[in-house]
């Protein structure tokens, strides 16, 4: 809300995952939304997905930003996104008391693979599902890729990010990412997803975005590569 407080054409409503009361949760009110964003802890909103779909406007979209259960960083030694523990998500949360440390901050929140996210959304009635890949992850991204604009060799070098927990460094993620890209597996092993679900229009859409979030706000620049329905591409820059 603070970030967009000067935007006259935008109203931001925040719904915590714990709010399931119809009298306070805006998702139960008789209103249509142009965009609904689930930023983390997607698993806690699964029972609300059908309700969200019903409350989207005709061209409205749902966006899901969350981690990938098969993200390369978890193979390399990062702990699980919400519950903690090494390799917990990779082993599909098969608890081992000697290695798995339950994290009460997020309760039973969990993350999914790309196919699992897409299947959950389809079962809730969503169509037009399209996956983007925030890098290094969905919490502190510097760029967002898509299947139509994938990273180049040597491009994924900013991998030492695991601020909330200790981590191991089992291999050089940059080198392994190069192999992943060469084998066409980036969509399965990206660290995080930004998933769009909803009715697609015939207008152009962004297939790649990069922004200099390491700079002071007045010097930051965002670069988007857009693609029209006829395949024509264009570049846009924002200061």
PLM segments and residue spans:
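Short alpha-helix
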Residues: 105-133
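C-terminal alpha-helical "lid/dimerization" subdomain adjacent to the S-adenosyl-L-methionine
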Residues: 80-110
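A short acidic, Gly/Pro-enriched loop at the edge of an enzyme's catalytic core
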Residues: 25-36
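Residues lining the SAM
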Residues: 39-42
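C-terminal lobe and adjacent flexible extensions of AdoMet/dcAdoMet transferase-like proteins
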Residues: 135, 140-239
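Class I SAM-dependent methyltransferase SAM/SAH-binding core
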Residues: 1-25
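A short glycine-rich, Lys/Arg-flanked "PGG" loop and its adjoining helix->strand segment in the class I
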Residues: 45-63
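Conserved class I S-adenosyl-L-methionine
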Residues: 63-89
């Amino acid at each position: 809300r603070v970030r967009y407080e000067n935007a006259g054409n935008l109203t931001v409503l925040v719904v915590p995952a714990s709010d399931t009361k119809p009298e306070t949760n805006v998702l139960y009110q008789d209103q249509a939304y142009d965009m609904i964003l689930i930023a983390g802890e997607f698993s806690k909103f699964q029972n609300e997905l059908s309700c969200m779909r019903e409350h989207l406007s005709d061209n409205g979209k749902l966006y899901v930003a969350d981690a990938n259960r098969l993200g390369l960083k978890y193979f390399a030694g990062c702990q699980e996104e919400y519950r903690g523990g090494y390799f917990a998500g990779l082993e599909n949360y098969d608890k081992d008391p000697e290695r798995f440390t339950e994290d009460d901050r997020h309760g039973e929140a969990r993350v999914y693979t790309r196919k699992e996210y897409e299947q959950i959304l389809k079962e809730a009635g969503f169509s037009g599902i399209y996956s983007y890949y925030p890098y290094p992850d969905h919490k502190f991204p510097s760029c967002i890729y898509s299947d139509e604009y994938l990273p180049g060799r040597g491009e994924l070098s900013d991998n030492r990010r695991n601020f909330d927990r200790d981590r191991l460094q089992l291999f050089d993620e940059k080198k392994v990412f190069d192999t992943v890209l060469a084998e066409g597996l980036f969509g399965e092993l990206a660290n995080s997803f930004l998933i769009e679900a909803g009715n697609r229009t015939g207008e152009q859409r962004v297939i790649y975005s990069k922004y200099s979030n390491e700079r002071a706000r007045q010097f930051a620049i965002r670069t988007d590569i857009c693609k029209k329905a006829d395949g024509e591409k264009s570049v846009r820059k924002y200061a």
